């Protein structure tokens, strides 16, 4: 699939604008995050947009704001999910404007690894309480997501619930998947894109980072470079994994230099050596 692009896709979300306060005294969270302040607006020119960056860089905050502004439940699920277990989302969605194209998604889902358990619980609860119509679980492979492993339930959701012409927002989906199953997810994403879907994804996965034709934004806390468009190979994530895999043992030795020294030289041995050395000084 190298070199294969999907630029012809018409996205529902064309652009997102964040109304950053002009008054610096109002620069509290989430506007205290450099990436939120600097991005201003995000244009979506590809059906797959990826946000990557270190923990705390603002990936999930931005993705969550877009999802909630688009009408999704902050904790995840389709637009029909209304459950709430804990109000932890930021208020950035209130200052988020979504510019939509003429295309309208026929389906949609906001998937968060951290609250996927709550989504699965809500599906089971609705099936128990709503007696009329087909059971919801039939759209998820016919088996409760709680009766599958985390990775199995995630892929079951994508394989059975997601269809073409959808808007799908994933917050760190790799948390549920092995590297091999991340490749399986990539195949599903590319299939759904060909069927007219749009994906917004935040990730720490070098596998997902390399989805063909994806538009990539790298976030950091570096002033002036907190929100940058780039290629996969230019990201800190890609460069880190490339360097690590070339020389994993050397990286570990450098990282754990002091710990490895202590492993070879237990503290009681070091104390005896220091004691003997000090005695020689005294005599």
Regions found by a protein language model. Name each.
Residues 140, 144, 148-172, 180-192:
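GG-anchored amphipathic helix commonly corresponding to the ABC/SMC/Rad50 NBD signature/C-loop
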């Amino acid at each position: 699939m190298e070199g294969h692009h999907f630029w012809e896709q018409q996205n529902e979300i064309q652009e997102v604008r964040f109304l950053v306060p002009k008054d610096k005294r109002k620069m509290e969270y989430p506007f205290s995050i450099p990436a939120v302040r600097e991005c201003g607006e995000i244009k979506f020119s590809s059906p797959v947009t990826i946000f990557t960056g270190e923990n705390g860089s603002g990936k999930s905050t931005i993705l969550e704001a877009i999802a909630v502004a688009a009408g999704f439940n902050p904790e995840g699920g389709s637009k029909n999910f209304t459950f709430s277990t804990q109000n932890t989302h930021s208020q950035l969605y209130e200052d988020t404007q979504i510019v939509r194209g003429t295309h309208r998604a026929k389906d949609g889902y906001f998937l968060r690894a951290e609250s996927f358990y709550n989504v699965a619980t809500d599906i089971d609860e609705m099936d128990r309480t709503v007696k009329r119509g087909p059971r919801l679980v039939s759209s998820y492979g016919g088996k409760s997501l709680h009766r599958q492993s985390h990775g199995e339930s995630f892929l079951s959701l994508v394989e059975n619930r997601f269809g073409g012409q959808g808007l799908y927002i994933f917050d760190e989906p790799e948390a549920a998947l092995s590297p091999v199953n991340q490749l399986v997810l990539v195949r599903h994403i590319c299939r759904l894109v060909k069927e007219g879907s749009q994906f917004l994804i935040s990730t720490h996965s070098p596998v997902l980072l390399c989805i063909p034709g994806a538009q990539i934004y790298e976030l950091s806390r570096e002033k002036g470079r907190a929100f940058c468009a780039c290629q996969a190979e230019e990201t800190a994530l890609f460069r880190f994994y490339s360097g690590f895999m070339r020389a994993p043992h050397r990286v570990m030795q450098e990282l754990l230099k002091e710990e490895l020294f202590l492993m070879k030289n237990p503290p009681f041995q070091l104390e005896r050596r220091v004691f003997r050395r000090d005695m020689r000084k005294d005599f």
